C-alpha cells in the first residue's frame, strides 16, 4: 500500500514538471538566428548547411504537433538523405517528410529533389 501511495506522489510531481516545461516552451516560442545553439545552450546536431538550427527545429516541431499535446522531435533522427524526421508522440511515433525547401546537402541541395540529397552523420 505504501508503494502505491509513493507511486501516486511521483506521478503527481511528474505531471507538475511536464506542465511547467510545456508552459516554458510556449513562452520561448520566439525564433532568433543561431549558430546551432539556442538561448539555453542546447546545441542541435543538424548539419552546418542548415542555416538556423533553432528555427529549423521549431518548424519541425510545429509540423509534428498539429494539434497533439506532448510531441517532440529528436535532432539525431532527422534523415537528410531521405528527407524525413521522427515525430515522437505520447502513444505513437510518426515518420514525417521534411519540407521541400529543407537543405539536404552542402551544395545547396533541397528536399525538393530528394535524389540529390546526401546523408549526414553528426560530428563528421
Swiss-Prot record:
Keywords tagged on the record: Glycoprotein, Secreted, Signal
A Pfam family recorded for this sequence: Salp15
Induction statement: By feeding. By the presence of Borrelia burgdorferi.
Stretch list, region CD4-binding: 105-124
Signal peptide: 1-22
Domain of life from the UniProt record: Eukaryota
Main location per the UniProt record: secreted
A cellular component annotation (GO) from this entry: extracellular region
UniProt key word Hydrolase: no
Family named by the database record: Belongs to the salp15 family.
Its biological purpose: Salivary tick protein that downregulates host immune system by binding to both dendritic cells, and CD4(+) T cells. Specifically binds to the CD4 coreceptor on T cells. This interaction prevents the activation of the Src kinase, Lck, and its downstream substrate Zap-70, and results in deficient activation of PLCgamma1, the repression of calcium fluxes triggered by T-cell antigen receptor (TCR) ligation, and a subsequent reduction in interleukin-2 production.
Stated name of the protein: Salivary protein 15 Iric-3
Amino acid at each position: 500500500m505504501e508503494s502505491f501511495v509513493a507511486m501516486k506522489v511521483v506521478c503527481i510531481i511528474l505531471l507538475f514538471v511536464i506542465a511547467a516545461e510545456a508552459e516554458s516552451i510556449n513562452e520561448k516560442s520566439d525564433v532568433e538566428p543561431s549558430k546551432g545553439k539556442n538561448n539555453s545552450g542546447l546545441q542541435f546536431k543538424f548539419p552546418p548547411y542548415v542555416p538556423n538550427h533553432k528555427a529549423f527545429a521549431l518548424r519541425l516541431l510545429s509540423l509534428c504537433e498539429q494539434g497533439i499535446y506532448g510531441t517532440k522531435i529528436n535532432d539525431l533522427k532527422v534523415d537528410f538523405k531521405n528527407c524525413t524526421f521522427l515525430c515522437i508522440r505520447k502513444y505513437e511515433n510518426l515518420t514525417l517528410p521534411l519540407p521541400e525547401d529543407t537543405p539536404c546537402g552542402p551544395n545547396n541541395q533541397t528536399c525538393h529533389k530528394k535524389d540529390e540529397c546526401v546523408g549526414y552523420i553528426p560530428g563528421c
